[in-house]
Amino acid sequence: MQLQLNAAEISELIRKRIEGFEADTEARTEGTVVSLTDGIVRIHGLADVMFGEMIEFPGNTYGLAMNLERDSVGAVILGPYQHISEGDRAKCTGRILEVPVGEALLGRVVDALGIPIDGGGPIEAQATSPIEKVAPGVITRQSVSQPVQTGLKSIDSMVPVGRGQRELIIGDRQTGKTAVAIDAIINQKGTGIKCIYVAIGQKASSVAGVVRKLEEHGALEHTIVVAASASESAALQFIAPYAGCAMGEYFRDRGEDALIIYDDLTKQAWAYRQVSLLLRRPPGREAFPGDVFYLHSRLLERSARVNAEHVEKLTEGKVKGKTGSLTALPIIETQAGDVSAFIPTNVISITDGQIFLETDLFNAGIRPAINAGLSVSRVGGAAQTKIIKKLGGGVRLDLAQYRELAAFAQFASDLDEATRKQLERGQRVTELMKQLQYSPMSVGQMAVSLFAANEGFLDDVEVDKIQDFESALQGYMRSSHGELLDKITKTGDYSDEIAAELRAAIENFKTTNTW
């Protein structure tokens, strides 16, 4: 039997096949892994890669393109890389690194990529944001005029921090730098300020301790913890602050206020140095790469107070008439008090002031161990509440005169009455500035203590009784003059009427002798 080939039938069949053919083509540049050393991968053949682009490796692993050379690309791998080997394919993604942002992250602990590590389930984020963003321009910024109360007498009275400011916390190891930052976070409870705590290169146990303390004091619900612990790769430690900053910018650009702590930027600089040296970039001073200043300046310049037009534009008109701010408290660890080292001088020059913590003061039991002479706030004075500004000036002056006279008094045997009084006043004010950890004070409580010091109510109290006197006075004010404290905390105003009320209350308390 002979088969008859029907040309019409065959052409119809071919036509249907052609019509049903779906050509889903995806143009992606692919390259080959040439070498892999210490988390740094060299790739050949990625012609169209951008700087900072995400590169996809087998096993759902990603890297960050950092060196674009003539015939190869140097990238850092974000995460474990044991399963990657020479000859593997690497693909361009056409995307830059983004992290989840939004309210859903509050109360959670995430890694540098925004992935939850607290066992609390996945995060349903409202949006994602690139970790690298251009800082707000000069025109979109607004001057710092509202305070961020840390709850610490010595900071709020002498080195005040404003919303949108960058205030450096600098000191040797074990001087209470993290304690100051954690107290500041705890004090934001109920103020509406969202907090981001970025832990860089710390022990996982230390981060767990911080999270536990925040939880105990009810401060975790308004805080995001971004942790890149010491066990994680240098690449993740290097990008963690940028990820935290992107999360803070979400609130800033919606007309809200946020506070970010970088703990600490010394370790970020070390991680960046490690990555740069492995990428064979030329080393400079202290073996840091040439752009280590830019590493910190582009991060800290993103902390700012932005005007209402900027917020309105970014929210597409949903939020009107509200300014937003991102306040930064970067931490730098010094070696043997050397603030003239490379990284400390860099960050001091970028920030709007510094809180200098000293080992000698810490060991002498003066905690927080703030050196009032070296600590300064360049823009915070404009943001201080009226009452703290009025009362804090006297305290700063007392301490400055005390430091000067104390050095002189070591050599002088007979001191005149005025000098002796000044020394005694200084000792009492120094004692008054001591504060227990995790016990931040309200503006009203602070005003009472500062008023007592300024008006000479402490002059007849023994130096070793000052702390007892203060806690008894605060207890008395809370129970008998709670309304006055609330009024001062709410308004922050200072008038002759308030001064008279405070004077009468403290005089009345002193007659009881209950301390």
UniProtKB/Swiss-Prot annotation:
Predominant location category: membrane
Keywords: ATP synthesis, ATP-binding, Cell inner membrane, Cell membrane, CF(1), Hydrogen ion transport, Ion transport, Membrane, Nucleotide-binding, Translocase, Transport
InterPro entries: ATP_synth_asu-like_sf, ATP_synth_asu_C, ATP_synth_asu_C_sf, ATP_synth_F1_a_nt-bd_dom, ATP_synth_F1_asu, ATPase_a/bsu_AS, ATPase_F1/V1/A1_a/bsu_N, ATPase_F1/V1/A1_a/bsu_N_sf
The protein, known as: ATP synthase subunit alpha
SUPFAM superfamilies: C-terminal domain of alpha and beta subunits of F1 ATP synthase (SSF47917), N-terminal domain of alpha and beta subunits of F1 ATP synthase (SSF50615), P-loop containing nucleoside triphosphate hydrolases (SSF52540)
Catalytic activity: ATP + H2O + 4 H(+)(in) = ADP + phosphate + 5 H(+)(out)
Subcellular location: Cell inner membrane
